[in-house]
Amino acid sequence: MSRVCQVTGKRPAVGNNRSHAKNATKRRFLPNLQTHRFWVESEKRFVKLRLTAKGMRIIDKKGIETVLADMRARGENV
């Protein structure tokens, strides 16, 4: 399963670890992904999404119906 937020599209970023001596080694910054079930009243069913904490805040703000409509418009399978 890919580490991509279904709502925001955030994916892992690449950067460096820096030691005290300023040596650089590659590392990945992973998004804060959570699996969460949301009740969709209009469809009378739960929708299971893999999303970041920011994605959950967006759903709290806009509502699950609006976010699902945006995702379906993008071609996301929900």
From Swiss-Prot:
Keywords: Ribonucleoprotein, Ribosomal protein. GO terms for biological process: translation. One of its GO terms (cellular component) is cytosolic large ribosomal subunit. InterPro entries: Ribosomal_bL28 (IPR026569), Ribosomal_bL28/bL31-like_sf (IPR034704), Ribosomal_bL28_bact-type (IPR001383), Ribosomal_bL28_sf (IPR037147). GO terms for molecular function: structural constituent of ribosome. It holds the Pfam family Ribosomal_L28. Residues 1-25 are annotated as: Disordered. It comes from the Bacteria. Belongs to the bacterial ribosomal protein bL28 family. PANTHER family: 39S RIBOSOMAL PROTEIN L28, MITOCHONDRIAL, LARGE RIBOSOMAL SUBUNIT PROTEIN BL28M. This is Large ribosomal subunit protein bL28. It comes from Aliivibrio fischeri (strain ATCC 700601 / ES114). The lineage of its organism: Bacteria, Pseudomonadati, Pseudomonadota, Gammaproteobacteria, Vibrionales. The gene is rpmB.
